[in-house]
């Protein structure tokens, strides 16, 4: 008789798991990006965090309903297969393996190195920081390959530690900023600048910037099989957990504004560490910076785990290039070594791209785009067919769950896609046109996306033909 997972988690544990999964290192460096996008407007910045949080709540609620229907499903690729079929599931898995996870992993390696480098006064684009980023990539790969238990302990420790700077900055920064006048000064004049197309353009850019900090919520639906009364508790856990995350991010953002001027927070070399040092002093700021580094390492470790398993998950379905090679499991480490090496190489390529496109003068010309944002928005676009097929297939669901909720989720995803096109297409196009140049990053990102997905199509069809032969 097949042994089933025990339903051992209650509602409170589920909420904690959602919060622990979603809250990550993105808030530490994206807070600066948000202010840069809004040109220092705190009101627009807060609006961006709230809007993206609302989109998170809508989509996570939709997935929670799907999770109660497909109780044996574990992971977004399985949801894709359940709703749209195995072919769509394969393409989503290919995208996540070769674009989504490695792009985020490459960025996180740099973010981790950047915050460690700040303590030594290194520039965020210095050779020292990039060398550290490379070492972090290789180090997390080695940790997962040779000591997965230790990697798991790092994950647990980082989950607790990453909450420390967020909570302290949210409380102490807000109090300090209110008493010394920094916080009111940062909000002064913000409401006056909210009218006009420029404000809307800035808001779209800020919304897309925040999406990195919220990513990871769909992983929380994987606890469905181990949750007591999942039909009741999972939707509540996702919504309440999401509200806690939104509140934490907004309060942290406000706390940072209480610890430093908007100009200081926009400083590309320091940003949030300015606020930490102003509020907690040099030593206190240094300690909190160490907490951020550990938090980033935990997130990087989690992303590396996903990156190294990607080709294995495809090969396990007898798909992709040479499934027998990527499906092999090392008897000593119980890891798919070939899949892990592929994941590491792709992560390194994306990190090099991120440096060349976003941190240097722009190595790739028209093909420069922000790899920390556009791949994440892409997955929202790829949710849309899943929601549509849910409405087509699930005839036994009530009207609200079959039509109303997925339609709202589709609108939320379309808004995110529109915001990305505006922020990474229309706005840079208008700015470049004013200088007599041309720029439309999102279009050239889609070219790269199409090429990588076409490679996936080649291997899918080739493998399918081999099976049929």
What are these regions (language model features)?
Residues 27-32, 143-149, 283-284, 346-370, ...:
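Transmembrane helix-loop junctions in multi-pass membrane proteins
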Residues 4-7, 46, 123-128, 156-289, ...:
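Helix-loop-helix junctions that connect adjacent transmembrane segments
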Residues 128-182, 215, 238-239, 378-381, ...:
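Membrane-interface loop-to-helix entry segments
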Residues 33, 57-137, 141-145, 293-310, ...:
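Hydrophobic transmembrane alpha-helices that form the core helical bundles
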Residues 36-41, 69-73, 82-88, 225-233, ...:
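Juxtamembrane helix-boundary/capping and inter-helix hinge elements in multi-pass membrane proteins
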Residues 76-81, 85, 118-122, 239-301, ...:
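TM-loop-TM module centered on a large, flexible mid-protein loop between adjacent transmembrane helices
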Residues 369-392, 399-469:
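A generic transmembrane alpha-helix motif of multi-pass inner-membrane proteins
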Residues 1-43, 56-61, 72-73, 197, ...:
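Membrane-interface "cap" regions at the ends of multi-pass membrane proteins
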């Amino acid at each position: 008789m097949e042994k089933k997972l025990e339903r051992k988690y209650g509602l409170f544990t589920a909420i904690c798991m959602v919060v622990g999964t979603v809250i990550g290192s993105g808030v530490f460096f994206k807070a600066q990006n948000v202010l840069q996008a809004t040109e220092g407007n705190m009101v627009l910045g807060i609006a961006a965090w709230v809007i993206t949080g609302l989109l998170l709540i809508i989509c996570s609620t939709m997935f929670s309903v799907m999770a109660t229907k497909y109780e044996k499903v574990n992971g977004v690729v399985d949801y894709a297969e359940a709703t749209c079929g195995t072919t769509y599931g394969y393409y989503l898995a290919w995208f996540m393996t070769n674009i989504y996870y490695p792009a985020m992993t490459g960025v996180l390696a740099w973010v981790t190195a950047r915050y460690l480098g700040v303590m030594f006064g290194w520039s965020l684009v210095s050779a020292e920081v990039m060398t550290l980023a490379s070492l972090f990539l290789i180090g997390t790969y080695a940790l997962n390959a040779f000591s997965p238990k230790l990697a798991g302990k790092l994950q647990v420790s980082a989950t607790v530690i990453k909450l420390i700077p967020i909570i302290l900055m949210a409380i102490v920064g807000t109090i300090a900023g209110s008493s010394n006048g920094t916080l009111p000064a940062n909000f002064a004049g913000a409401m006056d600048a909210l009218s006009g197309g420029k404000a809307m353009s800035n808001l779209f850019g800020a919304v897309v910037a925040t999406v990195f900090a919220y990513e990871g919520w769909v992983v929380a639906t994987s606890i469905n099989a181990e949750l007591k009364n999942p039909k009741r508790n999972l939707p509540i856990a996702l919504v309440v957990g999401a509200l806690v995350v939104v509140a934490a991010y907004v309060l942290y953002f406000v706390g940072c504004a209480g610890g430093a001027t908007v100009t200081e927070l926009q400083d590309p070399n320091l940003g949030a560490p300015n606020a930490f040092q102003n509020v907690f002093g040099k030593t206190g700021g240094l300690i909190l910076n160490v907490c951020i580094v550990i938090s980033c390492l935990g997130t990087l470790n989690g992303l590396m785990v996903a990156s190294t398993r990607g080709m294995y998950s495809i090969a396990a379905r007898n798909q992709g290039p040479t499934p027998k090679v990527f499906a092999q499991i090392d008897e000593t480490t119980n890891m798919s070594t070939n899949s892990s090496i592929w994941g590491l190489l792709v992560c390194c390529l994306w990190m090099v791209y991120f440096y060349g496109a976003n941190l240097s003068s722009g190595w790739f010309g028209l093909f420069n785009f922000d790899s920390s944002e556009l791949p994440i928005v892409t997955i929202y676009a790829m949710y849309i067919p899943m929601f549509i097929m849910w409405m087509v297939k699930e005839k036994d669901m009530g009207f609200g769950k079959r039509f109303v909720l997925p339609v709202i989720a589709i609108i939320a995803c379309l808004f995110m896609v529109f915001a990305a096109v505006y922020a990474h297409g229309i706005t840079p196009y208008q700015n470049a046109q004013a200088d007599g140049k041309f720029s439309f990053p999102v279009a050239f990102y889609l070219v790269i996306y199409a090429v990588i997905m076409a490679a996936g199509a080649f291997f899918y069809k080739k493998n399918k033909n081999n099976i049929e032969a």
